[in-house]
Regions:
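Secondary-structure junction/capping motif
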Residues: 1, 60-64, 143-145
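Charged, glycine-rich intrinsically disordered N-terminal tails and low-complexity linkers that flank
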Residues: 1-43
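Charged, low-complexity, helix/coiled-coil-prone segments
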Residues: 3-19, 94-105, 140-141
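Catalytic cores of nuclease domains that cleave nucleic-acid phosphodiester backbones
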Residues: 26-139
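Metal-dependent nuclease catalytic regions and adjoining charged, substrate-binding loops involved
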Residues: 143-204
């Protein structure tokens, strides 16, 4: 189904990967692209983590555009100080087993001691609340776009962090970087902790 729509829609980001190819060749092309993007995202995250932990940034030469945008982002987060990178969070079910888990990219503290979550996204796409959702909705009739999906992700992280530490999260935001962007984008997420709490209760 997806392959057919990608082939006829020249504006789709997968169109060039599948048009004129057999299903097998098209799937192979798409998987190769997805894997490459995943690896680039992982490499970028590692560069940011190493920089924040005062370690040598081994792949900095391969991520010059991303690192440049990252420095601009960090400079713009005035009053926030990095506290912890790559922090695992989880919530247990009734049996005490981890039912939901995630990893906070960066935890920051403000001048009053409040804690904030920052999540890195390597994408040139629209991460605004009004981004196109192709007529799809979820939760309380919210557009099912990347902004709201990532907002739910970070709301879950915020709740799990509070469950683990007893400390509330003041805010969550996305730091969006990509070589195709003219500049870094810092996107405040939508607070979906009410929906996230319902999901955690359902999982527990």
């Amino acid at each position: 189904k997806n392959l057919a729509s990608w082939r006829v829609n020249a504006s789709n980001k997968h169109h060039a990967l599948v048009v004129g190819l057999s299903d097998e060749e098209a799937i192979k092309n798409v998987m190769k692209s997805w894997n490459a993007n995943r690896d680039l995202g992982t490499g970028m995250h590692k560069c940011f983590e190493q920089y924040l932990n005062d370690e040598p940034v081994a792949q900095e030469a391969n991520f010059q555009a991303e690192m440049s945008q990252f420095h601009v982002a960090m400079d713009s987060l005035v009053g926030l100080t990095p506290v912890r990178t790559e922090m695992s969070v989880f919530a247990n079910d009734a049996k005490g087993d981890a039912a939901v888990a995630g990893q906070i990219d960066l935890l920051m503290r403000d001048s009053e001691g409040g804690l904030h979550i920052v999540d890195y996204k390597r994408t040139p796409g629209d991460l605004s609340p009004n981004a196109h959702a192709f007529g799809k909705f979820f939760l309380d009739d919210l557009p099912l776009n990347d902004h709201h999906k990532y907002s739910l992700q970070l709301s879950l992280y915020a709740l799990m962090f509070e469950l683990q530490t007893g400390q509330p999260i003041v805010s969550t935001r996305l730091v969006q970087v990509h070589p195709d962007l003219d500049e870094v984008r810092i996107v405040p997420t939508t607070d979906l902790r009410g929906d996230a709490r319902n999901l955690l209760e359902g999982a527990g």
